[in-house]
Amino acid sequence: MNEVVIPKKATKHQFPYEELVLKEDGESHPIWVNYDGLIILETFRESSRQASDFLIAIAEPMSRPLQIHEFQITAYSLYAAVSVGLTTSDIIETLDRFSKNFLPRSVRVFITECTLSYGKVKLVMKESSFFLETANESVYKMLSSDAVIRSHTIGKSKEGGGLSIEVEEVELVKKRCIEIDYPLIEEYDFRNDKVLRSLQIDLKPTTIIRSYQEICLNKMFGNGRARSGIIVLPCGSGKTIVGITAISTIKKNCLVLCTSAVSVEQWKQQTLQFTNMAPDGVGRFTSDHKEWPKDDSGIVITTYTMLAYTGKRSHEAQKIMDLIRRTEWGLLVLDEVHVVPAMMFRRVLSLVSHHCKLGLTATLVREDDKIEDLNFLIGPKLYEADWQDLSAKGHIARVSCIEVWCGMTGDFYREYLSQPTRRRRLLSIMNPTKFQVCEYLINKHESRGDKIIVFSDSVYALKAYALKLGKPFIYGPTGQTERMRILKQFQTNPVINTIFLSKVGDTSIDLPEATCLIQISSHFGSRRQEAQRLGRILRAKRRNDPDFKVYFYSLVSKDTDEMFYSSKRQQFLIDQGYTFTILTDIPEVHENEHCVYKTKGQQRELLAGVLLASEKELESEESEDSEGIVYSTTKLKSLSGGDEMAYIERKAPQGRTLAKGSKKSRKWNPRP
């Protein structure tokens, strides 16, 4: 599939002789607006709070440190603004009111071009079929004459005035409409839907909706209709409750997609906890559970993998899958929606008939640049919260982010310099100093009463650390029953205060007891993974205690590739206003005579084990939402398949001469 064509952005080239002109009272205003739609917000100005709320609605937050926030107006952000009710004049007039300088003409023109076309074309589902509808005759003629759209339609709707689209081609049609500057409106008139049976579901009186969650839902619902789109909230701030509230508002059949079976269990548990939904009205579709709601109407919770699987299924699983395909869903909730652009998962959207989509995520970033595809796969971004603002109000925990540099021992570093890339990576993770620092931090925080999660992408290192330090661990092959048992023990048993997790713990695991996180290895420079892991401790129960902080440690071996990737990983969190403290050394670690791998003999034994590890053991665990991006450092001979080959230059034997007159003895003599 071709890459989506990103709509144009505002540029100065349209009006090359225009200058930025400061208003007379500009000093008191909170924002600067540049030619290209870049907006700088000064958070220390009196009206900065109102300006920030407005900018979140019309622009993409790029960076939000303490004093200065940076936003970018894009075509997609303007589509989202219009989708929640803002008009062209609303956007231009409000932007001008907050701006220190007069709005550049390039920005005015760009806003006008992007917003006037929005809303003229709707995507509607009727009886499990999709239709493009418009009340504008000229727009209808333009759509029906477009070669790409025409090739994916199957005629007019029965009522006329609309084009019928093949279900499998909806994604391509939505993409094409964005390219021609006619983004589709996807709204569901659920109050007037008499075809789908209404669910008996309401929030319990004890369920409390926070102010920012209410803002999210107001962006999604308006005039009795539900808009398709994406809501971005920090980890631990209650994305699941937002989804559950949306379900209880629409009150129609709902399909919830998660990234793991553990997440499925948590969605079901919280649905029953926060609503009055009957237990037999919530079904699970996982490898262990094949359930369907009573009376054929209710909520089904499953994983992306279960729906995307193309192999042969068991009879029971195939039966549930057929029911999912045949059912007309009022709402499709996509948890951790950033995984959807992966080719394996995006086909899920065409498998099920649905009126409305709600995407939930904390990190709207990917390393493969496919995040833009969500604008036509799901819909516009409806709301994105400010992490630091929620932290200041006590909705998520205050965090101390610390990067600890761990010096490599001589033997380990000598091998590190000479080994192939994958084994070098394991050597930097198994660094004895990192082992000792990890042990020290665990002991320190356990003595303070903290609950600790240690993350490792390397399964070899995960097992080695956990077994050496005597802690339970969870990774891919760990059975569902064993996973739930370990997590339950971690939450309730005062003796089990530390657990080790592989990539399977990156997302959708709710552990409000955790107050400290230690990262010993990671997925190269993935910004998303860094933020997702931080989210495991943002929901700490004790977050409102006076002066309480949670701790996020990233252990990095000095003078290795880990230092380069660490700086890349931190960029998303820095853009959210977090700062990292760097510890170049912890003296207490060296003073402990009883720490692990203290002697040279123990370190050499550890090194021997790493060098003898098989190629299979060197692999990192693949997560279910892998982005398909692989980072590696290698040599040209590896790329060309010459790892097992060597170039040797042999000198010709000395003292031998060719016979006179031999053809091989002839020399070339250039003409003078």
Swiss-Prot record:
It comes from the Eukaryota. InterPro entries: ATP-dep_DNA_Helicase, ERCC3_RAD25_C, Helicase/UvrB_N, Helicase_ATP-bd, Helicase_C-like, P-loop_NTPase, XPB/Ssl2, XPB/Ssl2_N. Its EC number is 5.6.2.4. It holds the Pfam family ResIII. PROSITE patterns: HELICASE_ATP_BIND_1 (PS51192), HELICASE_CTER (PS51194). GO terms for molecular function: 3'-5' DNA helicase activity; ATP binding; ATP hydrolysis activity; DNA binding. SMART domains: DEXDc (SM00487), HELICc (SM00490). Residues 650-672 are annotated as: Disordered. Transmembrane segments: none annotated. Residues 436-594 form the Helicase C-terminal domain. The keyword Transcription regulation applies. It is an enzyme of class 5 (isomerase). It catalyses: Couples ATP hydrolysis with the unwinding of duplex DNA by translocating in the 3'-5' direction; ATP + H2O = ADP + phosphate + H(+). It is found in: Nucleus. Keywords: ATP-binding, DNA damage, DNA repair, DNA-binding, Helicase, Hydrolase, Isomerase, Nucleotide-binding, Nucleus, Transcription, Transcription regulation. GO terms for cellular component: nucleotide-excision repair factor 3 complex; transcription factor TFIIH holo complex; transcription preinitiation complex. One of its GO terms (biological process) is transcription initiation at RNA polymerase II promoter. Its main location: nucleus. Belongs to the helicase family. RAD25/XPB subfamily. ATP-dependent 3'-5' DNA helicase/translocase; binds dsDNA rather than ssDNA, unzipping it in a translocase rather than classical helicase activity. Component of the general transcription and DNA repair factor IIH (TFIIH) core complex. When complexed to CDK-activating kinase (CAK), involved in RNA transcription by RNA polymerase II. Also involved in transcription-coupled nucleotide excision repair (NER) of damaged DNA. In NER, TFIIH acts by opening DNA around the lesion to allow the excision of the damaged oligonucleotide and its replacement by a new DNA fragment. This is General transcription and DNA repair factor IIH helicase/translocase subunit XPB. It comes from Encephalitozoon cuniculi (strain GB-M1) (Microsporidian parasite). The lineage of its organism: Eukaryota, Fungi, Fungi incertae sedis, Microsporidia, Unikaryonidae. The gene is SSL2.
